[in-house]
Amino acid sequence: MGAVVLGKIHLRWCDECDLPILEQATCGICGGKTRQMKLTPPGDARPAFKSNIERIKSLVDSQFGEGCGAAIVPEGHIVLLNKAPDIDRMDEVIVDGTIVGAVRYELLAGEKFLLRPSGATAIAPLVRKSWVTIDPGAAKAVLERSASTLAVGILDCDGGIVPGDEVLVLDENRNPVSVGTSKMSASEMKGHKRGTAIKTRWTVIAEPRGSGKEADWKDVVKANNEVLTRRVDESKRFIHKVVSENDLPVAVSYSGGKDSLATLLLVLDAGIRPKLLFVDTGLEFEETKRNVAEVAREHTLELIVESAGDSFWRNLQHFGPPAKDFRWCCKTCKLGPATQLIQKHFPKGVLSFIGQRAYESQQRAEKSRVWRNPWTPNQLAASPIQKWTALHVWLYLMSKGARTNPLYEQGLERIGCFMCPATDLAELRRVKEISREYDRWQRFIEEHASEKGKPRAWLDYDLWRWKRLPKSVVDELGLGHEACLSMSAEQTDDAPLRFESTSGYNPCVEGLSMEGVFSKPLPMERVANMLGIIGSVTTSPDGNIAEVKSITVFRDGPVMIRAKDEEELRRKAAMLREIVFRAVECAGCGICTGRCPNGALHLDGLVTIDTAKCDHCGRCLGPCPAVRFKQDDLDI
C-alpha cells in the first residue's frame, strides 16, 4: 500500500534520556540533540498502554519462545505504536527509539509479529521457535545482497516451522542475519537442496538506539514541556480569535474520545465556559456514556444530549447493514440528532469547537480549520487541534491529569459506535471481547446472513463492512468469482418496488451524499442499460454494481449518490428513481421511443437502449406508466 502523507512527521528521539520528543531538535530534559524517527506515514504515533504491551509480549512469546516478548519490550521503557497502511491493520512498535517490529493482522491467520532488525537482535540469544541457522556463504549473500535464504544454505532449523511463519535467520554462531517469511516447512528445509526457504524482509544491520534508561510518561511530558506550551498557547489564541469574530454561544462537541476531551480542556484553558454537546447515536459504549457524564460533572458544565434512540435498529429493516461504502447510519444516527439539537437549543446559531485532526484522514487533512456543515448551517465548527498528532494530544491530556475513556486502556485505538463499519477487523475482534453491546449486533448479522443466503466468509471476516469488496480483501481471502457473487445473493420478492433514502453531509467521510435502498433486488442488466440515459455506465466484472456520474447502484438494492450541493443531490435522486422504476416495471408501451431523436430506444417486449446511438440527452425521460410517483414523493 502507498504512503499516506497527511502532514509532517514530528516524532524525534533523545537517545541519552531514551524519550520521544516532538518537533524539537533538542531534548527538554538533558538539552542534547534529538534525531528524526523514520516512521511509516502518516506517522500518527500514540502511547502503547499496558493491555497493548501485554498483547505484544504474548504474541512474540507464542511465535519465538518464552522470554522473547520481554526482550522486545523491556519493563520500564516507553513504548509507542504507529499505525501503518495495510489490508486490515498494522502497528509499528517503537521501543528505545527504534522500530522493533510490527503487529500485523492477517485476515486468515490473525495477529502476527513481524520482526525488524533491532527486534531480531534483542531476541537472538533467547529464540526457541521459528529460527534457522545458515552457513557462512549463505549469510554473506543475505547480508551483502539482501538475498533470500536458500534451502541449500540451511544448517539447522526449528522443527515446527510451516510455510507463512515469521522466521529469524541466524549464522552458525547464532548471530542474527535477517528476518522474513518461510516458504517451506521445517522438513522441506532440511530435505531440499534447492529453492527459496526464507524470503528476506529485513537484513539485520546496526540501527541507532536509545540508551536503555528506564522512564515513565511523566518524564516524556517533562521533556516535551516547551513544545506543549507552544502548541497550547497557539490553540488558545485561535480559540479567542474565533470567539471574538463570531457573536455566538460557545459549545464543545464531545464524543467521549481523546481528541474532543483535549479540545474541551483547551477551551477551558482559554477561560471560556462552553456548553457540552453529546449526540448519543444509540450505538455508544457504556464506558463512553459514563465518561461523558463524568466529564460534565467534573467541570460543572451544562450537558446537552440528543439521542437517536433506536433509529439505527429501525432503519436496519430498510437499509440492511451499513458499510464503509454505504454509511446511511451517519445520517440517521449522527447528522439527524445533531441537526435537531442545534435547531432546538441554538436556533440563532452556535460556535462549536470540535476535536478534528488532519492526521486522522485525507479528507480531514484537506479541510479548513473553521468550516460550516451545509446540513447544519446554524453550526459554525472550529478545530483548535487540527495540526496536532495523537502524541501531542496524549501528552497534553497527561499534563492535565485528565481522566480519559477507559476503553483506550482496554486496547481500542478509536472510540465511536461499537459496530462502526469503518473499524478494521483487528479492532472489531477486540470490541467483541470487551463489549456487551455487540451481542445484539452479532445476533442481527447472523440472522441477516441466514435470511439473505450469505456465505460463511461473510460472517467469519465481517464482510458486511463493505457493499463492494476491495480487491485486496478478495485476494487475501482467496475468494473466487462465485463467492463474491454470493456476498450479495439475490432474493426473490414479488412486493411492489419502493425506494427509501437518507441524505446529508456525511460526518464520517466529510462529503455530501445520499444512501438509499430499493425494496427488492434489481435486474442489473436492465438497470445498467437504462442508466445509459444519463451517461456512460461502468459495471463490475460480476455485474453486481453499476456506476454513472457519481451514482452507484448495487444488485441487492442499495444505492449511493454523491453531489456538490443539495439541489444536485435531489435532482440525481429523482432521476435515478425514475430510471430504476422504468427498468424494473417497464410495461412495453413504447411511449418513450418516440421521444428519442437518435433512434436509440428499441421495443422488443421491453424497452432497451442502443448505447452506440444514445448521446445521454435524457429526452426520453418523461410521462411513463411505470413511474407512479411525483417529484415531491422522494423521501429525503
Feature locations, PLM:
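ATP/NTP-dependent adenylation/nucleotidyl-transfer catalytic domains that generate, transfer
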Residues: 2-91, 96-99, 103-107, 403-575
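RNA-binding accessory domains that recognize and position tRNA/RNA substrates
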Residues: 2-253, 265-274, 281-284, 493-496, ...
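Short cysteine-rich clusters marking metal-coordination/redox-active sites
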Residues: 14-17, 27-30, 586, 593-596, ...
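Iron-sulfur cluster-binding cysteine motifs and their immediate structural context
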Residues: 32, 591-607, 619-635
